[in-house]
Every structure is written in structure tokens, then in C-alpha cells.
Amino acid sequence: MTELKNLLEAKNRDELRQWLKKNHATELECWVTVKRGRPKEDETFWYVDAVEEALCFGWIDSTTKKLSDNCTIQRLTPRQKNSAWSELNKERCRRMERMGRMTDAGRDCCPDMSGAGFVINTEILAARKSDPEVWANFQSFPPLYRRVRIDTIQINRRMRRPELFKKRLDKFIENTRKGIMYGEWNDNGRLL
């Protein structure tokens, strides 16, 4: 395995935040041990906490590595200028701003955060509107769910992955027809 630069011993978001305060403008990466899943009120350093703090300083999560059966590390790096932003990460930034945790470095990296910054692909729009039941159910879903779910589909169009675009669109239409919201779209309620 290649050498891991800046493998931090941060045990929580506040310890990572302190490191980012000191190093976000000069370092190119860090690694933190995190756990994925539904955060609980315990001493675990959760993935979503690390991502939120990274976003506050203009950083983003990237590669994960499994060090052992019970230890996964997450690489965090500065965002590249003009990189694609997921709707989920935009909403995380909005939450951090409301909580007073966002820094100028984080704000400087943010894309258009207005509603005008999210445009639905015409193929997805047509597929939803072609079935009245799908359209009615879609309209009843929370706006954040709609943006996050659509974003995870249309990113595959932008990345020129037509098979995955079709597969995700079909799954979305099928679940929407049944009135089912699926997948992680609100960080287990944090973003509501």
C-alpha cells in the first residue's frame, strides 16, 4: 500500500475541524478513520460528520481504504475548482451554514446554491410526466428527495454512462409509481 499522508487520529468532528482550521489551505490530503451507517449518539466518528466538516473548509471526501475488517479510512482533499457538486453535498453546506460552521474557504468553493442551479434532464422529466401516477407521486415527495434522487440519475448522463443512467432512471420510475422513497437522501433526517 502506498504511504498515507496525514493519517489523523481524529476521534470526532471537532478534532478534524481543528486540523482543517490549521491545514486546509496548505495540505493536499488527510485520512480519517470513520464509520458508515446511521449515526448514533456515541463516541463513533461517523462518515457524514467528516464530510460535513470537510465541506466547511472547501474539502471533499474521495477514496476509502479498508485497513482491517473493522477499520475503514476516508481520504479528504481540497475540492478542485469547478468540480461537480451533488445535490446532497449542496444541502449539507446549507445545513452547515445554518449551524454557523461554514467558513469563508468553504463558501468560496460552493457552486450556485439557488434553486436555479438545479436543472432536470429533459429525458427524466419526460419519463416522469408520461405516467400520471408517477408524476403525482413525484410531486408529493419532499423537494430535497426529488433533487437528490434526480441528481444521482442524471450525473450518469453527464459522465457518459448510459447503461447506469437507464438502470437508475428505471428504478426511480418504478419506485415512484409505487410511492416509495428509497436510498439515503437526507442523512438520516439531519437535512430535514
Regions found by a protein language model. Give the residues of each.
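Charge-dense, helix-prone N-terminal extensions
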Residues: 1-192
